[in-house]
Amino acid sequence: MEYYHHSINKMAMFMVILVLAIDVTMVLGQGTRVGFYSSTCPRAESIVQSTVRAHFQSDPTVAPGILRMHFHDCFVLGCDGSILIEGSDAERTAIPNRNLKGFDVIEDAKTQIEAICPGVVSCADILALAARDSVVATRGLTWSVPTGRRDGRVSRAADAGDLPAFFDSVDIQKRKFLTKGLNTQDLVALTGAHTIGTAGCAVIRDRLFNFNSTGGPDPSIDATFLPQLRALCPQNGDASRRVGLDTGSVNNFDTSYFSNLRNGRGVLESDQKLWTDASTQVFVQRFLGIRGLLGLTFGVEFGRSMVKMSNIEVKTGTNGEIRKVCSAIN
């Protein structure tokens, strides 16, 4: 009996060590680590946090803007701040990036940090931290952000083709995510960022009036939701008008986005497909805690997936640079 308990204790200790090893691997990523600036610029993270909070208080739309910007940065050439670079043919000029916002928030934080820690903190890290702080500003859960990224020196609009599109099938979405080392759960979790933010009428109009050139709406749209969307985005109305991606909860980081998918009230075609495809529907159900399935806590899993995404093709050590100004290479 004593040997039995001893074996159980050893096994329990092994499992704890294994879990810790997994968490450490997740946090450290490819040369990044939590607290990278703790000795070289200890105020960096608090400056980013306060800057995001100040801008959010005057304009809540910066939160989804920054979160989307970080996603777009990581999916193109890795998380290296290349989305921040200005230029006639830079990433931010590509069609999927033309409505990004929050550049001023990142530059504001960078200016403050440079004043006390010149040449230390990368723009890529500021963006990663600001994305986390944007979720917190909208009442989402926090997570530890590994830092230590360096800034890239290449930014090309042509590379934006790696980004998932609003009309992509689930198979295409999964392929694009898998290419970046992200699995199906990561896909559903990260797309859950659409719980905050908006989309332009231009990207949903065909879905409302001429889906797949049928002359009618997407049949997956709930019958009571369709007239609401059509009222917001008339067939010949303002294509630039914005529509909330999470009806009724556009400014709160919560699971109502997934409830909307279950009820046929997803705004984007690619979002609603997460419910109609069995391989992704199961994760939507698990985030909703549907009985009979092993539940997943959305806020926790979102943070885990964000850490994975934030370590895509990062530049560390002597690769890249630390920009003096986020919008231009040194």
Curated annotation (Swiss-Prot):
What tissues express this gene product? Expressed at a high level in roots and at a trace level in lower leaves. Not expressed in upper leaves, stems, flowers, seeds and shoot apices.
User: Which reaction is catalysed here?
Assistant: 2 a phenolic donor + H2O2 = 2 a phenolic radical donor + 2 H2O
Q: Which residues are glycosylated?
A: N212
- Which residues are annotated as site, described as Transition state stabilizer? R68
Q: What is its EC number?
A: 1.11.1.7
InterPro entries (UniProt xref)? Haem_peroxidase, Haem_peroxidase_sf, Peroxidase_pln, Peroxidases_AS, Peroxidases_heam-ligand_BS, Secretory_peroxidase
Q: Which residues bind Ca(2+) 2?
A: T195, D246, D254
In terms of pH, the activity is described as: Optimum pH is 4.7.
Q: List the disulfide bonds.
A: C41-C117, C74-C79, C123-C326, C201-C233
Could you list this entry's UniProt keywords, alphabetically sorted.
Answer: Calcium, Disulfide bond, Glycoprotein, Heme, Hydrogen peroxide, Iron, Metal-binding, Oxidoreductase, Peroxidase, Pyrrolidone carboxylic acid, Secreted, Signal
Needed co-factor(s): Ca(2+); heme b
Localization, UniProt: Secreted
Q: Name one GO molecular function term.
A: heme binding
Give the record's cofactor note, including how many are bound.
Binds 2 calcium ions per subunit.
* List of residues binding substrate: P164
Q: Which domain of life is it from?
A: Eukaryota
Could you tell me what induces this protein?
Induced rapidly in leaves after wounding, mRNA is detectable 30 minutes after wounding, reaches maximum levels after 4 hours, and decreases slightly after 8 hours. When lower leaves are wounded, mRNA also accumulates in upper, unwounded, leaves. Wound-induced expression is enhanced by spermine, and suppressed by methyl jasmonite and coronatine. Salicylic acid and ethephon have no effect on wound-induced expression. Induced by infection with TMV.
Q: Does the keyword Transcription apply?
A: no
Give the range the annotation lists for the signal sequence.
1-29
Which Gene Ontology terms of cellular component type are present?
A: extracellular region; plant-type cell wall
Task: Name the Gene Ontology biological process terms.
Answer: hydrogen peroxide catabolic process; response to oxidative stress; response to stress
What is a single Pfam family found in this protein's UniProt entry?
Answer: peroxidase
* Task performed by this protein: Removal of H(2)O(2), oxidation of toxic reductants, biosynthesis and degradation of lignin, suberization, auxin catabolism, response to environmental stresses such as wounding, pathogen attack and oxidative stress. These functions might be dependent on each isozyme/isoform in each plant tissue. Can use NADH, NADPH and monolignols as substrates.
Query: Which family is this protein grouped under?
Result: Belongs to the peroxidase family. Classical plant (class III) peroxidase subfamily.
UniProt protein name: Peroxidase N1
| Protein source organism | Nicotiana tabacum (Common tobacco)
Phylogenetic lineage: Eukaryota, Viridiplantae, Streptophyta, Embryophyta, Tracheophyta
